[in-house]
Design a protein with these regions (language model features):
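Gly/Gly-Pro- and Ser/Thr-rich, intrinsically disordered tail segments characteristic of DNA damage-repair
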Residues: 1-203
Length: 203
């Protein structure tokens, strides 16, 4: 059976999946539009038995709902995004430090660049991420602007790409910003105590 695409319904379903993942796997989860979810599982995957059991468990839970999923872990958001969409296996773990080898043969479209830039790069003869990353940066930046270099740097871990996590509507949280980093244990204890009191009053 074929049904018409419904972008609004798809976006709503993706939002629900993101909130589900927030409660199951990691406190740092966001929509990776248009068809994915990104999570920072560092420090959390051991709660699922490790990286492979966690990935396998996620894939199995989707399969139980008659949904197909591709799940990847990599050093960077960009690399995980690309591998999950290009590699046909259900689960992919890119070993630490192996990002270049994992993505260099993948198509340019997985760099999350605007379609116009991808089309122009194809016209110039570029097909893969590796071909593009091997070229001098300056001429490409002059022609295509900074976005191309930014996406390459994010994929290879040369530029940070923070995840702006989703928050549940009923989430209660408190925070304190500091002008300078603090490291003294007694100072941390003092402010944690204050934050706990603030949190209790919000409950």
């Amino acid at each position: 059976m074929l049904v018409d695409t419904d972008p609004a319904a798809d976006a709503a379903a993706l939002e629900r999946i993101t909130l589900w993942a927030l409660g199951q796997y990691s406190p740092i989860v966001a929509v990776d539009a248009p068809d994915g979810v990104v999570m920072d599982t560092e420090g959390a995957d051991h709660l699922q038995g490790g990286e492979l059991p966690m990935l396998t468990g996620i894939a199995n839970r989707f399969r139980a709902k008659k949904l197909s999923a591709r799940v990847a872990i990599a050093d960077t958001w960009g690399a995980a995004h690309a591998c999950a969409r290009a590699i046909r296996r259900e689960t992919v773990i890119v070993p630490i430090g192996e990002t270049v080898r994992a993505v260099e043969g993948l198509p340019l479209s997985l760099l999350r660049l605007p379609p116009k830039i991808v089309g122009d790069l194809h016209t110039l003869g570029f097909k893969t991420i590796g071909e593009l990353s091997a070229k001098p940066r300056a001429p490409l930046a002059l022609r295509f602007g900074p976005e191309l270099g930014r996406r390459l740097d994010q994929m290879f871990g040369r530029m940070a790409e923070p995840i702006d996590p989703v928050r549940t509507p009923d989430l209660i949280e408190v925070s304190r910003a500091f002008a300078e980093p603090i490291g003294a244990a007694e100072t941390i204890d003092k402010y944690v105590g204050r934050l706990v009191k603030e949190l209790v009053t919000e409950l």
